[in-house]
């Protein structure tokens, strides 16, 4: 079985969760349009890089998780690898 893979070369903005998720959605839609079964994004795509002190804020990490869950709900028909921070367990 062959799988077509899209590698997203994106430039996310640090701290702009909504904007970065919207950018990811555009890449995902384009990858689906081109018949890809998987799209891979860069490290910390969702929160931007380098997030530095933002990672010390519990609220920011919670917002990242909510944004990631919304993005996952909106994604159908393609596998997505996307970088996002997570709170320690």
Ranges and model annotations:
Residues 1-89:
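Hydrophobic structural segments
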